[in-house]
Amino acid sequence: MHSIDLFDVTIIGAGPAGLYSAFYSGLREMKTKIIEYQPRLGGKVHVYPEKMIWDVGGLTPTPGAKLIEQIVQQGLTFNPEVVLNEKVTSISRDLDEGYFILTSATGNIHYSKTIIVAVGGGILSPSKIEIDGAERFEITNLNYTVKSLQHFKNKVVMISGGGNSAIDWANELEPIAKKVYLTYRKEALTGHEAQVTQLSNSGCECHFNSYITKFIPNETHDRISSVELMNHRTKSTSYIDVDEVIINHGYERDSTLLQKSSLPIELVEDFYIKGTSQSESTVPGIFAAGDILSHPGKVHLIAGAFQDAANAVNKAKQYIQPDAAQTAMVSSHNEIFKQRNKELIKQFVK
């Protein structure tokens, strides 16, 4: 074999599933690399930094931003190599040596004995509103995510969308904003029942069968002053003065990496990796964790992603070293943490 920097496992994606994969592979003493398309670690949780996350076992309700901080710290425990701003565009295999070759959009090449795909819902970008000139307001008061609830305090906010995220944002903002409006093309909202009920009982003013047709700028033409709504049933228009506009029309995802792979990675619904409960794909040596993995009994929670990650790493370890233990030793009795535990205990007994 010619001289290459060969890793035991390369993890594509650095959300909760990818970061826990990195931690667990370090626990199993594997040479690990993480490749992330975004300029930072944490994945889609960054879209909801102030939303409370309740369903991670052992954690009290935690804001998304805090959860990111914790999972990043854990994921980097064993110092994996981290590559940010890197989009993997193809995966192939060296037929002579058996290792995988990952090529990026920049032309960089990575070599790995195994791969864990942990890209969540894929490379996501918010679906933009199709109104001429809308992009110029993106630097002022046209928003595609809610990064800070405080930013909207005492403001008049218009939200466009009727799914879970739009309803969540409306419920979160209604108590602190001056006024919240929500416009949706359909007759009724499509979110979870409890969230819809909460919104219906709040002071949020909903405009159904309606959509934004125009942004009216202020005198300096750098901010949205009001929005024009069209009711497609009555064909009537109305105008609402606003301070902020939030668009939540879903996300566009780039799934070309898997769809156009030269390897026989079987997909479900032309996107998700068809796998097993042990995180195995249809290609030996390629595993999956998190939302991208599909199998009967799949748990679509962050907690489920952690189990996927551990399974993927254990199978990757045994793929490389067939006589390796099926799982890592639990952390409470693992010698790898002996020195770290001494340092932590000193902090606790001060």
Listing of model-derived features with the role each one plays in the protein:
Residues 130-153, 244, 248-303, 311:
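FAD-site-proximal beta/loop scaffold in flavoenzymes
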Residues 338-350:
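Acidic, Ser/Thr-rich low-complexity intrinsically disordered segments
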Residues 75-104, 109-112, 174-275, 324-331:
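A Rossmann-like FAD-binding core segment of flavoenzymes
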Residues 1-12, 27-28, 40, 81-155, ...:
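FAD-binding core/adjacent interface of flavoenzyme oxidoreductases
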Residues 167-169, 292-335:
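A conserved FAD-binding loop/helix module that cradles the flavin
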Residues 7-78, 167-193:
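Beta1-alpha1 glycine-rich phosphate/pyrophosphate-binding loop at the start
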